[in-house]
Amino acid sequence: MELPILPTSVIGSYPKPRWLLRMYRLRDLGKIPEEDFKEAVKDASVSVLREHERAGVDIPWDGEMWRTEMTEHFTAKIGGFKFYGPVRVWGNAYFNKAAAVDKLEYKEPLVLEEFLWVKKNTTREVVKIPITGPYTIAEWSFNEYYPDKESFIMDLAKIINKELKMLENHGALYIQLDEPAMLNHPDEVPLAVEAINKAVKGIKIKVGLHVCYSNYYLLADYFDEIRVTQFALEFANRQFRDMDFLKKLSNKELGFGVVDVHNPRIESVEEIVKAIKKVFEYVEPELLYINPDCGMKLLDRNIAYNKLVNMVKATELVRKELEREGKKTTEFRTLKDI
């Protein structure tokens, strides 16, 4: 499969419509039937999917409309977890942090329903399915059952592997493991790498790895060892500084973060063009994808949309220059190709 050179994509989350947030609150209060809530989620999914497509994104997603939070969604579906109540993250932000109280088991599909819905409703050939990785799920949960962190993480890796195989069997082409916590403890990075490789064992489709707001020099030491096709990383937030670690990227792809999801300022087309050209010093255009730094759910929806619009406009300008050099398309690479 061939894609336009510099394919554009998203990382995962996107601002939920206000009416969907109200439906979440009503559902939590038990004031609406589950079927009404599910209908609202599906409507929001299509709405955001169309928004991404209207912005011109080549490889969209539905902004995780089905998910409350990136770990809670998964721990609620995996057997062996228990919720005690909300935990404060920062300021007035809380999330339901789960505890492993029994051996974890794969009880039901984790994201299959949302993937099939997006696949049915998209106008694009490829969508990217974000899935929180085993290390981050463990790091952001309590362990009240396993004798050590390693056995906890490896059981999660086995469960994620089952989900990935199910998605592949149902036609998924591109999965992204989200591991924002994998560099939190430098001495545990080898454990995180082992868990990722276990999670993707036997998978043949395209797999990306998203890591953000971390020491990428630490990650770069494992570029070759981690069995993924692409590393989706944030650069706009760090103002595109200190990118020498990319020299170790070898034949892996880079998902290049060009808009800051923690700053409401909408980046100009010109500055995004400049950033893309700068990364050409390290990565060949054929190995480069363009995306936001991270999930966009904390932004105002209109701001998020216009950031995507400018991201796509900038990419199209750079494409025109590359086309004059005879570079028009890029191969859609999978794990079979690395």
Curated annotation (Swiss-Prot):
Keyword Repeat listed: no
Keywords: Amino-acid biosynthesis, Metal-binding, Methionine biosynthesis, Methyltransferase, Transferase, Zinc
Top-level taxon in the UniProt lineage: Archaea
Cofactor(s) demanded: Zn(2+)
Binding residues annotated for Zn(2+), in chain numbering: 210, 212, 234, 294
GO biological-process terms attached to the record: methionine biosynthetic process; methylation
Note describing how the cofactor binds: Binds 1 zinc ion per subunit.
A GO term for molecular function: zinc ion binding
Biological pathway: Amino-acid biosynthesis; L-methionine biosynthesis via de novo pathway
Enzyme class: transferase
EC number: 2.1.1.-
Function, as annotated: Catalyzes the transfer of a methyl group to L-homocysteine resulting in methionine formation. The physiological methyl donor is unknown.
Family in the record: Belongs to the archaeal MetE family.
HAMAP family tied to this protein: MetE
NCBIfam families: PRK04326.1
Protein name listed in UniProt: Methionine synthase
Gene name per UniProt: metE
